[in-house]
Amino acid sequence: MSVSRDPIGPYHDHLALLHDQLRIAQIAMYRQNRKAIIALEGYDASGKGGVIRELSYAWDPRGFQVYPIGPPAMTEAAHPFLWRFWNRLPTPGQIAVFDRSWYGRLLVERVEQGLPDTEYETSIVEINA
């Protein structure tokens, strides 16, 4: 019995199949006038960019938009916490990919930047609304 010791070969075969499935799903979404949000969350250097790169490789660039989410800009900070996400919701047939999400405020800003209790509680209420 022969066992392949080359992990790259099977990986590339499987990845090519996944790319095909992603492409088919994007076309179906467009034809059915559906929209989707993909929110990636994770530590810095955890692979979020690699996931976005693989999605980008498979999809027609006219059908999706990637939004890197960092600290809110001055104009964003003047609005409710979720405003910057509301303004980036996809239109029918489109996909929005968020590189970090609304949960980041609860996960990262709370620990790293000392998000005040009142803002933390308000964020939870807004997310669950």
For each of these PLM feature ranges, what is it?
Residues 1-129:
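Glycine-rich phosphate-binding loop of ATP-dependent small-molecule kinases
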